[in-house]
């Protein structure tokens, strides 16, 4: 299977842009890091078509040292220059930070399953746009780990790949905050625009871990040890160092992630440390329908198509 990911180190011809206000580097097995060289350069100085192209080819784009959007309204306005933004019951901008008494693991500081965004609502966003308002120290955890599923599939042996192509998984989560329901999804499906294969996977909670509002994960046609072994194999491949990269947040980082291709999770960190991200979802064109089958047990309104 051919991977869409760019495996060679360094930049490609298409990455070049004649502007000396930033440099471009490859911080991990995938993704690019743009670092401002001129103080006060706003993130809006980097053309969105250029960033969109980088995000679609490298799947993860981080901007560091730029003047970031000043507040949630400014982040919303910036995201709208990318396209149609997703509306949630809370609005368009989600404050990703720990709650004192969390009702869901999203608002906690410990283990979080690897997942893709939009799985429990009507549409899967193409991009996540993050702004880091505050971050723990470099050695204090709290990074966001991303898995490039094109690399997982490119490195799978033919027998494993054939087996995985026939798998359908079921995920259920009670809706105690802004998401929940039943999702029935193939493990592998084509990228909606480019056609290369990507994975849809919500990691089961490992033995020994406990999270608030734990999801259930099952595989159609497999039970017991057979299902557990398959889920463990998928998880092991996702966390292979060749397939993952952790973005260690710094204040005012702006990150664009390709949610069609990547999975992601939060690295645990100690409660009380400063970690505050803002996130906006940008829908594809046309928006990609999710694999949600029902919203059983949901509360409140669901997501809506956004506005530009």
Regions found by a protein language model. Name each.
Residues 2-42, 56, 93-251, 256, ...:
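Active-site environment of non-heme Fe oxygenases that use a 2-His-1-carboxylate facial triad
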Residues 44-52:
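Short, acidic/polar
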Residues 67-70:
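A short aromatic-anchored loop/beta-hairpin motif
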Residues 74:
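Classical protein tyrosine phosphatase
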Residues 77:
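Short active-site loop/helix that positions an aromatic residue
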Residues 81-90:
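Beta-solenoid repeat scaffold
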């Amino acid at each position: 299977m051919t991977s869409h990911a760019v495996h060679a180190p360094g930049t490609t011809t298409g990455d070049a842009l004649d502007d000396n206000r930033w440099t471009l580097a490859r911080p991990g097995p995938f993704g690019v890091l743009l670092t401002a060289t001129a103080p006060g350069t706003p993130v809006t100085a980097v053309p969105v078509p250029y960033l969109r192209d980088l995000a679609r080819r490298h799947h993860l784009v981080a901007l560091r040292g730029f003047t970031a959007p000043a507040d949630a309204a400014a982040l919303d306005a910036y995201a709208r220059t990318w396209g149609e933004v997703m509306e949630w019951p809370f609005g368009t901008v989600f404050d990703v930070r720990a709650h004192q008494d969390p009702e869901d693991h999203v608002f906690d500081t410990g283990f979080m399953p690897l997942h893709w965004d939009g799985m429990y609502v009507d549409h899967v966003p193409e991009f996540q746009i993050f702004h880091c308002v505050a971050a723990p120290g470099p050695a204090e955890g709290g990074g966001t780990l991303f898995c490039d599923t094109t690399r997982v599939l490119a490195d799978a042996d033919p027998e494993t790949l054939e087996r995985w192509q026939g798998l359908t998984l079921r995920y259920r989560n009670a809706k105690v905050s802004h998401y929940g329901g039943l999702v029935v999804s193939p493990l592998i499906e084509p990228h909606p625009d480019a056609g290369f294969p990507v994975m849809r996977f919500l990691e089961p909670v490992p033995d020994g871990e406990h999270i608030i509002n734990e999801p259930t994960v099952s595989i159609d046609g497999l039970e017991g040890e057979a299902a557990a072994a398959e889920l463990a194999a998928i998880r092991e491949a996702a966390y292979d160092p060749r397939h993952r990269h952790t973005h260690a947040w710094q204040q005012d980082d702006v990150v664009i992630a390709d949610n069609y291709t990547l999975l992601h999770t939060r690295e645990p960190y100690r409660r009380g440390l400063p970690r505050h991200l803002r996130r906006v979802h940008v829908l594809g064109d046309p928006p990609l329908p999710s694999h949600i089958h029902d919203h059983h047990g949901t509360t409140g309104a669901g997501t809506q198509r956004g506005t530009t």
